[in-house]
Amino acid sequence: RGFDTRIFKQAGYKTFNLGSSAQTPIQTKVLLSRYFQNLKPKMVIYEVYPETFMIDGVESSLDLIANDRNDIHSISMALQLNNIKTYNTLIYGFMRDILHLNQTYSEPLNRGKDHYITGGFVERDMAYYTPGDIEKKDIRINPGQFSTFRQIIAFLKSQNVRIILVNAPVSSAKYRSYSN
């Protein structure tokens, strides 16, 4: 959601952001499993933000279950995360799907400072950086996230998809907050 699809379009590329904020490799694998055959990408630009490799993925699982269809990949994700919040949301999500309660729902294109742009980009109103202290932390990679990331890379390579790994810029204060 952080790559402006309009810029790629101006350069002659057809793109789609297949992600959300705080999305971990576990959710990326679900989306890739669900949509790869329809999208058939020739290239994948994958943002490898360290903190998404550190978290458990529960928050993003709730978002994915609530905002996309639910299927065997949703169940697999819930079992991998093994968290009561994910299980409860999955049950609720399947109930909404079975009762067709999501068919008429339409996500608003504008929500607060966020504005959806065709292709999966979310533009945010201009805000000025205000420096502040950021708590120091070690980067501690969650083994499950890293294992899933490796599976994604292996799958994309097996499909002859060009992969570009990027790390979006962060403020120098944020960068210095990592203690290892």
Located regions from the model:
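Membrane-embedded segments
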Residues: 1-78
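Small-side-chain structural scaffolding
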Residues: 19-21, 28, 84, 89, ...
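Generic hydrophobic/packing signal
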Residues: 22-27, 49, 111-116, 156, ...
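Secreted/periplasmic serine-hydrolase-like ester/acetyl group-modifying domain
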Residues: 61-164
